[in-house]
Amino acid sequence: MSITKEQILEAVSEMSVMNVVELISAMEKKFGVSANMSVNTNNNSEKSTIEEKTEFDIFLKSIGPNKVSVIKSVRSATGLGLKEAKDLVESAPTVLKENMSKNDAESLKKTLEDAGAEIEIK
């Protein structure tokens, strides 16, 4: 035998306010939900836009065992001179390059990881 929604509503309408509050609390615990959840009642066809990140920074976390190879890769990627590239690599952890496209950042990350560096894209 199943109880209908109408029967439940009738039973709840006959309860005191305190009993209804206790019932809601018990239902929240039993079903793991909150009665305070917000409901979007806006009828506009407004869509929330999720901004996709378009610029990325290459962050050198560590040099790894092959320092010379990493310096060469950094030098070719950044256009820095040998001394500047060496100083930059030795200052790890540091940002190597900023405001790159996703494809360029992924490509540079692969190149530097192949050289032995530990890289993070932020």
Curated annotation (Swiss-Prot):
**Which is a GO BP term held by this UniProt record?**
translation
InterPro entries annotated for this entry? Ribosomal_bL12, Ribosomal_bL12_C, Ribosomal_bL12_C/ClpS-like, Ribosomal_bL12_oligo, Ribosomal_bL12_oligo_N_sf
Gene Ontology annotations for the cellular component aspect, listed alphabetically = cytosolic large ribosomal subunit
User: What is stated as this protein's family in its record?
Assistant: Belongs to the bacterial ribosomal protein bL12 family.
Q: What Pfam families has UniProt attached to this entry?
A: Ribosomal_L12, Ribosomal_L12_N
What keywords are assigned to this protein?
Ribonucleoprotein, Ribosomal protein
Task: Briefly state the protein's biological role.
Answer: Forms part of the ribosomal stalk which helps the ribosome interact with GTP-bound translation factors. Is thus essential for accurate translation.
Q: Which domain of life is it from?
A: Bacteria
Q: Which GO terms describe its molecular function?
A: mRNA binding; structural constituent of ribosome
Q: How does it assemble?
A: Homodimer. Part of the ribosomal stalk of the 50S ribosomal subunit. Forms a multimeric L10(L12)X complex, where L10 forms an elongated spine to which 2 to 4 L12 dimers bind in a sequential fashion. Binds GTP-bound translation factors.
This chain belongs to the protein called Large ribosomal subunit protein bL12
